[in-house]
Amino acid sequence: MTDKTEKVAVDPETVFKRPRECDSPSYQKRQRMALLARKQGAGDSLIAGSAMSKEKKLMTGHAIPPSQLDSQIDDFTGFSKDRMMQKPGSNAPVGGNVTSSFSGDDLECRETASSPKSQREINADIKRKLVKELRCVGQKYEKIFEMLEGVQGPTAVRKRFFESIIKEAARCMRRDFVKHLKKKLKRMI
């Protein structure tokens, strides 16, 4: 009997694995790994792929030499190396430095005009963020109160919003936070 135990201890090939143990990772782990690979691969989109192909072409000698590539890039952007504006068809500079006439206010106006959101969309976004913050253990409530101030609409909408957040906080066992929310709700009414 001791011979068998010694043989098992010395020869691992005779040891049988349990049915639950296998060499490949579990299904969930494989799914997580695949998701990570997709996320990491998302950064390597067409831009990175085209850069890789250009580098490979330059290494193999089938593409444009680097000196000609610089001039073609300059033609494409319309700027020479000395930051002078150029005509698209030629390498002759037009003259003068290029400056931007846009201010930060113009940019903010364009962003709001290009993507107008309704009150419902904004409030739904705030509610999603609030619920996420509520579920985090040990959070400070100042951030949540700041988000609650961003709720848009009449007082009836704000009141419903506060009531739904109070219910969510009670569900998450945040009694002290519920007290603070009820005080704010009374002040609002």
Swiss-Prot record:
Gene that encodes the chain: CT45A3
The answer to whether UniProt assigns keyword Chaperone to this entry is: no
Q: Which family does it belong to?
A: Belongs to the CT45 family.
Q: What is this protein called?
A: Cancer/testis antigen family 45 member A3
Q: Does the keyword Nucleus apply?
A: yes
| Annotated compartments | Nucleus
Q: In which tissues is it expressed?
A: Testis specific. Expressed in cancer cell lines.
User: Which is a Gene Ontology cellular component entry for this protein?
Assistant: nucleus
Organism of origin: Homo sapiens (Human)
Q: Cite the entry's keywords alphabetically.
A: Nucleus
Q: Can you list the disulfide-bonded cysteine pairs?
A: none
